[in-house]
């Protein structure tokens, strides 16, 4: 879906004379990058989802070059807020912890919890997409995070509860 679905959307945007296509990229394309992570950081997708998101972004930017379709891409870091995912690995930690809190089970932390994540609230994601759609700039890639990475241990401390390190 991340590649073929994106290509279908790009073709639809091109056929429909859409003014701007904003691709929902992912920070996962960087792999386990040091923070802060800039847009020019080395791409190192460590698993199929990350690779497929990066390939979708490359397709969107290719349509920009080949078909002159106005495109921007936003590489979203760990989004949280209403309707947050409660399953998954890297990007779902906030939702997984909320589910564990509601179920009154210990937080499962992989490793020692010192690893950090950059979180961004869902309404900030919406604002970023609107800004990327309205800008006169095209062919741009933007990282979207709060710019203030937090450790997993700190996140658990904020939510409050017992921890099981695995």
Language-model-detected regions and their locations in the chain:
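Catalytic helix-loop patch of NAD(P)-dependent Rossmann-fold dehydrogenases
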Residues: 1-11, 15, 19-20, 28-73, ...
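Residues in well-ordered alpha-helical elements
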Residues: 7, 87, 95, 123-126, ...
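Short-chain dehydrogenase/reductase
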Residues: 29, 77, 141-144
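Conserved sequence/active-site signature of Rossmann-fold short-chain dehydrogenase/reductase
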Residues: 29-30, 79-81, 93, 125
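Glycine-rich "substrate-gating" loop/helix at the edge of Rossmann-like oxidoreductase active sites
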Residues: 46, 77-90, 111-122
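Hydrophobic alpha-helix immediately C-terminal to the catalytic Tyr-X-X-X-Lys motif of short-chain
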Residues: 55, 59, 63, 93, ...
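C-terminal substrate-binding subdomain of Rossmann-fold SDR/epimerase-dehydratase oxidoreductases
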Residues: 102-166
């Amino acid at each position: 879906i991340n590649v073929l679905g994106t290509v279908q959307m790009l073709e639809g945007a091109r056929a429909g004379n859409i003014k701007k296509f904003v691709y929902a990229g992912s920070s996962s394309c960087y792999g386990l990058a040091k923070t802060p992570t800039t847009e020019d950081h080395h791409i190192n997708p460590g698993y199929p989802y990350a690779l497929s998101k990066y390939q979708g972004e490359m397709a969107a930017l290719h349509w920009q070059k080949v078909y002159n379709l106005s495109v921007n891409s936003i590489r979203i870091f760990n989004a949280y807020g209403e309707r947050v995912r409660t399953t998954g690995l890297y990007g779902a930690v906030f939702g997984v912890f909320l589910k564990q809190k509601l179920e009154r089970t210990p937080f499962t932390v992989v490793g020692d919890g010192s690893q950090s994540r950059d979180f961004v609230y869902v309404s900030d994601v919406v604002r970023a997409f609107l800004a990327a759609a309205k800008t006169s700039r095209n062919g741009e890639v933007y990282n979207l995070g709060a710019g203030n990475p937090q450790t997993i241990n700190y996140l658990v401390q904020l939510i409050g509860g017992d921890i099981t390190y695995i």
